[in-house]
Amino acid sequence: MKRNILLPTDFSKNSWHAILYAIELYKNNHCNIFVLNVFSAVSNSIDSLINMEPGSELYERAKSNSEDGLAKVLDMIAFREEYNSKHTFIPISTLNYPLEAIKNVVEEKDIELIIMGTKGEIGSPKVVYGSVAMYVMEKVRNCPVIVVPELAKHTLPKEIVFPTSYKTHFKKRELNYMVEIAKICHAFIRV
């Protein structure tokens, strides 16, 4: 059975790093890998969503840039020496708020795991997690999230930390993914 994995990207080095990490993590598994780019035309996404309509010049230009960026990412993956035929890459370009787009794709494509970078294209060196990564970790409750640190090596983890206050009840499905990843990596789980 193929896994459905979501890789949000803003075309930053950090998101590319997370894509490579995901490919390495699931190199022995058959996967549908959805590469998502959420576009807008201006830095203020509220103005962008209000002012952009399909067919408008602003919308079409932003969508074209997004689709071109996704095509470049897929080309970069295809040209890698360790290109894996077990992986099917599906690009998704959409106009939305990043968190809402991620939630929609998780639901529509039956996503089992989100793997993303910690910081986006305009990430500050003083910030550990970008705002999108933080929102996804906090707000996406029906799908596990792996956030790959900017300087993480492309080696798989030997230890997985599971932080808990013991007040939250976790579903078996949520814990199964962590156990599966621990098995893939031959890693210990520390609570």
Residues covered by each model-derived region:
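Short, charged helix-to-loop "capping" segments that act as catalytic/coupling loops
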Residues: 81-86, 137-153, 163-172
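A short acidic, glycine-rich active-site loop
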Residues: 54-68
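Gly/Ser-rich helix-loop-strand patches that form or flank binding pockets
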Residues: 102-153
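General small-molecule cofactor/ligand-binding pocket signal
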Residues: 34-36, 90-94, 146, 190
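Small/aliphatic-rich secondary-structure junction motif
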Residues: 1-56, 159-191
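Structural beta-alpha unit
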Residues: 75-114
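Inter-domain helical "communication" segments and dimerization helices
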Residues: 46-54, 72-85
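Short, solvent-exposed amphipathic alpha-helices that sit
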Residues: 21, 65-76, 101, 174-177
